[in-house]
Every structure is written in C-alpha cells, then in structure tokens.
Amino acid sequence: MLLREIKDQTKQVVQEVLELSDLQKGQIFVLGLSSSEVIGGHIGKNSSLEVGEVVVETILEILDQKGIYLAVQGCEHLNRALVVERELAIQKDLEIVNVLPTLHAGGSGQLAAFKYMKDPVEVEFITAQAGVDIGDTAIGMHIKHVQVPIRPSLREIGQAHVTALASRPKLIGGVRAAYQEDEIRKGS
C-alpha cells in the first residue's frame, strides 16, 4: 500500500469523525494506531515507522488548523499512556510520566508524535471528547462518558479496521426530565 493512499484515507476518516463528533477548539482527540495492522500484519508484530509518521502528521495538520489537541495512545507495554503537548498536560493538570516510546513499546504513532509535536510529553491518563482507533487498539478507556460510536464511511485504513468514538453529556433525571438537543444524537 502506498503511503499516499494511507494519508488520503486517514484524512477522510478524521474529517468525518470531526464533523460527526462536533469537536470544538481546545478539546482533545485520541488516536489509537497499529501500523502493523495497517500494513496487513498482526498488532504489535510488524510496526512501521513510515506509516506512523504519515498518519500522525496528517492528523496533526487537520487538528492544528482547528485548535484541537491530539493525544496518541501507546500500546499496553506503556499501559496505554499517551503522548500530548506539554501545554495540554499543564493546562489540564495531567501527570507527566517519564518514558520515551520505542517502535515496540509505545509504537510508531507515539514515535511520530514525538517527532511532529512541538513539546511532547507522556501522560498516563486523559479524558478526550472523541477519537479514532486504527487497528483495534482499544481507545475507549480514554474517551469521556457517554461514548457514542461513529461509523466512518471508510471501514479500513490500509488493512486495519477503523472505529471511532465521540462523547455526549450524560442524560440524568429519568422520564420527568427534558433534554437539550445535541449534534451527536440528531440523527438518532
């Protein structure tokens, strides 16, 4: 698969997820990425730095224009810690942890985030408003409740299965309560 094709597919999926999730400036978008799955391998076994770089660089270009922060999830060897900009970690009072990702501990996406972000750091936990999962990496633990599945028109980037999540405010109060309309549930 050509890197150009991966870039185009990534761009299409991320733009759709942003549109459907109604993410706003200052909010957080999580990326879970298995470059191994993108190139047709098994998660964690065939990592590709080139794929990680093209995916992360493409997403950062889109998010930076909108003022949305990117958080890049690492693999289970790093307890699914995330690379974020130091500015975000300070702003949200996130605990910074001391680890540098490698190709097989953190993965290609995290290495790319360290290359392309201005001042990257690792944090252990985050609560993001939306995200995309390329290769079934399980990003749900980092998405705010209540999570709403999003189905992008492309179901794969390369050979990796793609899913996405947005979030909405919890509905409380039961049958007597009235609720405001929100963008995510309009189509429901």
Curated annotation (Swiss-Prot):
SUPFAM superfamilies linked to this entry: TTHA0583/YokD-like (SSF110710)
One Pfam family cited in the UniProt record for this chain: DUF436
Stored InterPro entries: Antibiotic_NAT-like, DUF436
Organism superkingdom: Bacteria
The family this protein is said to belong to: Belongs to the UPF0340 family.
Protein name per Swiss-Prot or TrEMBL: UPF0340 protein SSU05_0314
Taxonomic source organism: Streptococcus suis (strain 05ZYH33)
